[in-house]
Amino acid sequence: MYRAASYNPFNESVFLRTWTEDGQRIDTEMPFRPYLYLEKDGAEDAVSIFKTSLMKKTFKNSLERKKFVDNTANKRIFHNLGPEQQFLIDMYKDQNNDPKFSQFPLKVFLLDIEVDTTAEPGFPVPERAAVPINLITIYDTLTKSTHTWGLKEQYTPTLPDCIYHRCKNEQELILQFVDFWKSDYPDIASGWNSSGFDFPYIINRFMRIFGEDFVKQLSPVGNVRGRKVFTDMGKEVTVWNISGVSLIDYMDLYKAFSPGEKESFSLNYISEIELGEGKVAYNAVSLGELAQTDWKLFVDYNIQDVHLLVKLEDKLKFLEIARMIAYKGCTNFEAALGKVAVVTGAVAIQAHKQGMVIPTFPNNLDREAFEGGFVRDPERGIQKAIVSFDVNSLYPNTIITLNISPETKLGKVIQGDFENLANDPKGEITIRLLNDKIHTLSGEKFKEFLIKEKVALTKAGVLYSQKSKGILPNLIDQIYKERVEAKDRMSALKKELSQIEKVIKSKENRA
């Protein structure tokens, strides 16, 4: 039950944002030292998925651990996770599947900014943040209130629980906004294309006006940092992180969680198809001209953009989905849009439940290329008696059925027609086990081996033990069952809703 975790390597602690048992929002600092496991004969700290003995090694901070890992060549390292995730797993690995774990609501700021596009030709560049911010709107999901800060004349809100803050200049707007932000820090801040525009523009503009130290106030632990990444189009951009507050782009959420191709990912198009309403229409040439000629409509435009996000989240619950995904792997919420951290965390937790620790290989380890998934070649020609099967969740159920998991893998067939054992029982099969020992068996002996030792044979010729359920099959089975239960509940609720609608319609007809 957490809202965020921020690790500080300099004071060896984690700043944890959580709740009390009765739902009060609290922040607390807890001592924490990162660690990892190493293989050592006779060690008793833990057991790896390979059944080897492990020794726990603790470090003063993450910098010391990284230096150790960088200097450790060609050695298997275990449970070398990020400090925040390691801390969260230690704290919550036995609770994260409990429905009560997510019982308290998060404080989400849905936001949108406008800038003075008349001050400079062309579209404003977030990295430069050269023109003033003239409008910011935030919707607070916890208080159900809207706050707008603007530079021009007074504005009378038409929406309930909407407060307009008139500011004399941009400096006052920024100061008031930051005071509001830090009066009760959000758990998540989100907007449409906010990682591409709003967040970088806010941070760079604030730094330009007040300096780097001022921007640190956006974080409850005073830590705001950026890192350079390349977009799919090859453009270098800065992705910002505010420790203690998850920055999540709602457009990225929509792309990740909404099925099917879309003609456009503009907020106007998506809100039209999802909600049946779009952005505020205007006749001005640009938003810059609109701000100069009709300030009220300009503010309406900005507020409507935020309230479209509110309505999208009310309908789609994508931020709630991101929260549930993050809890599965004990990560901070922004990691839900990735794959590695959540999956690694979920597997590490499942391994712990089965009394094992997973490997996390150092970056400098030489890695061999992975062979792609098995695809059977089609047989050309006219076929008779064709049957088409639609298998429910084929890949997950294949993993469960064959017990495919790193620790259950025994070896692989390297020679022989193992698919034709029934027709050629005397043919020879050669297998290589994980210890690199090679055995050649007759087809008949190979079949006996599979049955006696409870071994599953995949179409790619890989051998998996069936003696005990693997980590991945266990995890997938659990998630699959939860999915089935959720779909059953949805089906029951739809039937219940249909009955309610019939009753209402019947009463309306009688009236």
Task: Name what the model sees in each region.
Residues 285-403, 412-419, 504-511:
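Common nucleic-acid-contacting/processivity interface regions adjacent to the catalytic cores
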Residues 146-151, 156-164, 168, 185, ...:
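Active-site-proximal helix-loop-helix substrate-binding element of RNase H-like nuclease domains
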Residues 3-44, 95-188:
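Conserved RNase H-like, two-metal-ion catalytic cores of nucleic-acid enzymes
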Residues 186-194, 325:
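Short glycine-rich phosphate-binding loop at a beta-alpha junction
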Residues 391-511:
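Helical catalytic core of nucleic-acid polymerases
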